[in-house]
């Protein structure tokens, strides 16, 4: 936005239904990719295509219909859980409940007084971090998006819940292309493809095993987070 080039020489493609993990140090350009996808700003060079179409040729409303997104700074507003998930889209209660179940939010919602009618405080301050993330995930999944973008949005989930969520995405959203932006390799190592960013450039692109064997940046992140342990 200020004239500084944030990303350079980024070139990759994804097939429908594939999962892409994006990892890199803070400031490497991970979240900029999301902003470009949503056309919060456009690339100065090159193109971004969805189904073969340059996204600059799409009406903004049409473009946004492709996506279900959970960003780091997404907020919950002071209203019921149901309305926070619905987000003005007029889904049926059954659709809301299904989205909550898929996002692993059903169990904790059922334990709340009034359940889906439970009133949240501003920013969801009366929920835990993991609960807030699951409500936001419910919002994203409710629209059954063609492209799901999760920007470090499962960081507060425990391992078991994260694993269940991955299984749901694999089984029930098999045709949805998923982009996972994460700080932890454990959150993306199961992705079909992983994009490694360093200072706005593509340092590596491949699956976990390939990058672990060939990419120095990925190896450094991995060993720094695991102490060198090999986690399948």
PLM ranges: what are they?
Residues 1-232:
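ABC-type nucleotide-binding domain
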């Amino acid at each position: 936005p200020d004239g500084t080039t944030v990303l350079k020489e980024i070139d990759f493609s994804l097939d429908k239904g594939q999962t892409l993990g994006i990892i890199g140090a803070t400031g490497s350009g991970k979240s900029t990719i999301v902003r470009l996808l949503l056309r919060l700003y456009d690339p100065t060079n090159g193109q971004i295509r969805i189904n073969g179409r340059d996204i600059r040729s799409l009406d903004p409303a049409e473009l946004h219909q492709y996506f279900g997104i959970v960003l780091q700074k997404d907020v919950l507003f002071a209203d019921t859980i149901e309305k926070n998930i619905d987000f003005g889209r007029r889904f049926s209660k059954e659709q809301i409940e299904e989205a909550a179940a898929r996002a692993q939010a059903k169990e904790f919602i059922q334990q709340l007084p009034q359940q889906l009618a439970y009133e949240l405080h501003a920013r969801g301050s009366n929920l835990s971090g993991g609960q807030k993330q699951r409500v936001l995930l419910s919002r994203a999944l409710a629209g059954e998006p063609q492209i799901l973008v999760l920007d470090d949005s499962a960081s507060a989930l425990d391992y078991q819940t994260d694993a269940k969520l991955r299984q749901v995405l694999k089984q029930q959203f098999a045709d949805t292309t998923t982009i996972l932006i994460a700080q932890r390799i454990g959150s993306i190592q199961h992705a079909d493809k992983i994009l490694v960013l360093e200072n706005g450039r593509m340092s590596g692109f491949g699956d976990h095993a390939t990058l672990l064997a060939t990419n120095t940046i990925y190896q450094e992140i991995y060993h720094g987070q695991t102490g060198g342990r090999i986690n399948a």
